Design a protein with these regions (language model features):
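Residue-level signature of the C-terminal ends
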Residues: 51-55, 73, 92-95, 136, ...
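Alpha-solenoid helical repeat architecture
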Residues: 33-37, 74-77, 137-138
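HEAT-repeat alpha-solenoid elements in large eukaryotic scaffold proteins
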Residues: 1-8, 38-51, 86-89, 100-110
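Flexible loop/turn segments at the boundaries of HEAT repeats in alpha-solenoid HEAT proteins
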Residues: 14-19, 55-63, 96-104, 112-123
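N-terminal "cap/leader" segments of large eukaryotic alpha-helical scaffolds
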Residues: 1-41
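Core helices of alpha-solenoid repeat scaffolds
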Residues: 22-27, 59-67, 125-130
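Buried hydrophobic core positions in alpha-solenoid tandem helical repeats
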Residues: 28-30, 69-71, 132-134
Length: 157
């Protein structure tokens, strides 16, 4: 767990945007998820979801940078909300709202904020961690395995 938290400092969070503006609050939320207390971890994950995948679609550029940390947290047995993390990763993997909107409204592609590309980058980030998901299929927790299977299925498309 310490290794993942050390890597947080290598991400330029101040330069990235989430749904609230600057993504500087994301490292604290990720660290809080590792607290071991289920209620605290779930509350932090809910707040993180609102910042990176609100309403089920990728909201800003910080999502892709957050995905590797979520994948690592999902592997740690001491993290109490691993199922919810996998569900969030599936939402990110399935996100195509900006891409679909750009088909109908191509001017969206000319905006300074490149939501379509941020969404694609986030999906690629989830796909890059397929091996992590496969490793969870052998876990004893049936709910975790089901969430991992659903995510693996979404990545198989």
């Amino acid at each position: 767990m310490e290794t993942i938290l050390k890597n947080l400092r290598h991400v330029p969070w101040r330069e990235l945007q989430d749904s609230t503006g600057s993504a500087t609050g994301i490292p604290l939320l990720l660290a809080t998820i590792t607290s071991g207390d289920e209620a605290t971890a779930v509350a932090a994950l809910v707040r993180l979801r609102q910042r990176i995948c609100q309403y089920g679609f990728v909201v800003d550029q910080a999502t892709a940078a957050t995905v590797p940390f979520l994948c690592e947290l999902a592997q740690l047995p001491q993290v109490p909300c691993r199922v919810q993390i996998l569900q969030l990763l599936k939402n990110i993997a399935d996100a195509r709202q900006w891409e679909n909107t750009a088909i109908a409204y191509p001017k969206l592609l000319n905006r300074r904020e490149n939501y379509v590309e941020w969404e694609r980058e986030a999906r690629r980030a989830v796909r890059a961690h397929r091996g992590t998901i496969q490793g969870l299929l052998g876990e004893p927790d049936k709910e975790l395995v089901q969430a991992a299977e659903e995510l693996a299925s979404a990545l198989a498309d």
